[in-house]
Amino acid sequence: MTSFVSVDRLSGLVAPGDLVVVGQGSAEPTALTQELIRQRHAVSGLRLFVGVVLSDTFDPERTDGVSFSSFGALGNTSRLAKAGRVDIYPVHYGALPELFSRGHVVPDVVMLQLSPAVDGAGMSLGLASDYVVDAARKARLVIAEVNRDTPWTYGGELPTDLRIDHYVEAERVPVELPPARCGKVEEAIATRVAALIPDGATIQTGIGAIPDAILTALGSHRELGIHSGMIGDRVADLVEAGVVTNSRKSFDRGLTVGGLLFGTKRLNRFAHRNRALRLCPPSHTHGAQVLASIASLFAINSAIEVDLTGQVNAETANRVYVGGVGGQVDFVRGANASQGGRSIIAMPATARQGSVSRIVAALSGPVTSLRSDADLVVTEWGVAELRGQPLADRARRMIAVAAPEFREELARAAYGMKT
């Protein structure tokens, strides 16, 4: 039976050595997580599985005695990675629920955020329909923060088989992620990407400066659709401007589909009881069969570096995790399988104030996306079309979209390449 619990008692509910899975992003139940961290010394061997972290809850300087794991170093999880404090599971986001449902990762406690019941409808998952649900089905103990300021979302209805053991009540603004500031480089990339996308296409993109710039650049398009893992404020802008109608989607017609809402109060107001917005689990947002069935799916992802053959590293820089496998491969392959779909890797040509080329002869980190899946690579300098091209032509096309000061060096490297 579900019972109210005071946050002061959290350390008495969590056993030594427990693995606690917590909601991610804006769906982090901060009333619970912040108190758990405050009480961390009362629970020896405390382990936390976190996702995309937007809050400051898990700052490395305030989490001594706690070990962390995640599927990437996204958001503020990168602080833990930089400090050598997080163990990474290199898993496709679409397969992440299976880590828990198949017993590869065994959760003891799950802490999640819910929206209260409204007008006879049950509680809602609110801001995230994700792997936390699968973890909760396997956990010994499930504790919910029922937050009055969390939007009630369709598709996010609390599953009837999900047991909530304890809950706390909260009334606080969920963790916010404001739209990113975009500079001239991001705007140049966005202009090139927008020119590739036809009216009526269905868009997948992430969060951050380049995705936000691309969504802004799509402001003159018509009848676009959205099917994405993450949805932010810029998607709400396009819906309210009449650019996104979802009217030409071949799957989930009329619905903006996503798994996570990462934005501000403006996005939360847009999402609350919006029948045209549907939150779905990773099996739907990232499922291979679902994505392949969406005609004209344009998947837009980014990279830390791309080599001359089209291999993508979206995980590490200088041997430190700063990204993750995430949903990139799910969407790259889904878009390639979509009728009329395209996969786009959009990134600046350089890093570190222009001192390092992101287009490289050989990756310095892991291969996240294979060259056999490569389609379009876009930088501020141009568009490299790699699909259907042999290696020598790929190298020439990639060099052409590199920053000019690095092209000669890349050409020399390409001349000596055998594979």
Region spans (language model):
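Conserved alpha/beta enzyme-core scaffold
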Residues: 1-419
